[in-house]
Amino acid sequence: MSDFLPFSRPAMGAEELAAVKTVLDSGWITTGPKNQELEAEFCRLTGNQYAVAVSSATAGMHIALMALGIGEGDEVITPSMTWVSTLNMIVLLGANPVMVDVDRDTLMVTPEHIEAAITPQTKAIIPVHYAGAPADLDAIYALGERYGIPVIEDAAHATGTSYKGRHIGARGTAIFSFHAIKNITCAEGGIVVTDNPQFADKLRSLKFHGLGVDAWDRQSGGRAPQAEVLAPGYKYNLPDLNAAIALAQLQKLDALNARRAAIAAQYHQAMADLPFQPLSLPAWEHIHAWHLFIIRVDETRCGITRDALMASLKTKGIGTGLHFRAAHTQKYYRERFPTLTLPDTEWNSERICSLPLFPDMTESDFDRVITALHQIAGQ
């Protein structure tokens, strides 16, 4: 229908169009100077020394795990309440994903669950900053240091998120997403931040065929026209067309996230009169990026299932999302780990629903969602 309200919509404007035109007019549209500019600006945001732009956050996770040497027989701890790409990358490297439970009310992986899963084979811990809020990094990094295990932060939801006064990523290595529904987007893309120069060099090589330089380096840096493969790599570089859009979005991040926060505050106020349960906020000091606004739809409390609610909202022209169906309940992982039970993850996986939330959402759009929820709840 023409008046369908999507669950998310990218906030694009004249700045993004101008940025794309500049790149097209330059004659250099693949990885080049806009990538370098994006990496520098993102380091200013997070406080890291190095950033490596990639074609997606999934690509970033893949090469980050490779750069750590993750392989056959290794174990990587991650929540099941995450997008399946993390699990897929672990498996495709021959390693074993060790999925752990989350806090029932925040959906954050807990240090207690992480520590209980550590074995001599554990080679990485991947906490997820869920929905725009931060995980408890002090406790998680303390575990990593105690056991000598690297931490890779899944920050796909966390552009603009801070933990105890520092932007996510500032503690070590984190992977951000520029996917179409994220707080800033360039359609598809991602970026990895780190303070380790050797790790950053490995990422740069792995993202571009295993070469020591990319096409722009060879064109502009006076390097030999034929670079040498240092180790087999992938084609995960980000075109400058995408980087230019991401740069334009990054310049608007504060305003975009402020609008998201305002809508989230309205949702919280409205939920006081509705049976649907929002996620709880983390107890530690933080700034929430409000990537998602999630409610839990418990049939006993609400008189309707989550799936029925989503279907009903769809008939009213309102889109919703599911973030996420727990990874261990999906076919491949269900069959690979048939005895795995994660009670709080499973309870939420059956009940969570993401409501529309995006910067260009109007007051009329918001009222429409709340009116529909009241109608469905029989109020």
From Swiss-Prot:
Keywords: Aminotransferase, Antibiotic resistance, Lipid A biosynthesis, Lipid biosynthesis, Lipid metabolism, Lipopolysaccharide biosynthesis, Pyridoxal phosphate, Transferase
GO (cellular component) term, any one: membrane
Spans traversing the lipid bilayer: none
Superkingdom classification of source: Bacteria
Self-association state and partner proteins as the record states: Homodimer.
Family stated for the protein in its record: Belongs to the DegT/DnrJ/EryC1 family. ArnB subfamily.
Chain's role: Catalyzes the conversion of UDP-4-keto-arabinose (UDP-Ara4O) to UDP-4-amino-4-deoxy-L-arabinose (UDP-L-Ara4N). The modified arabinose is attached to lipid A and is required for resistance to polymyxin and cationic antimicrobial peptides.
PANTHER family (UniProt xref): TRANSAMINASE, UDP-4-AMINO-4-DEOXY-L-ARABINOSE--OXOGLUTARATE AMINOTRANSFERASE
Protein name: UDP-4-amino-4-deoxy-L-arabinose--oxoglutarate aminotransferase
Organism name: Salmonella schwarzengrund (strain CVM19633)
Lineage summary: Bacteria, Pseudomonadati, Pseudomonadota, Gammaproteobacteria, Enterobacterales
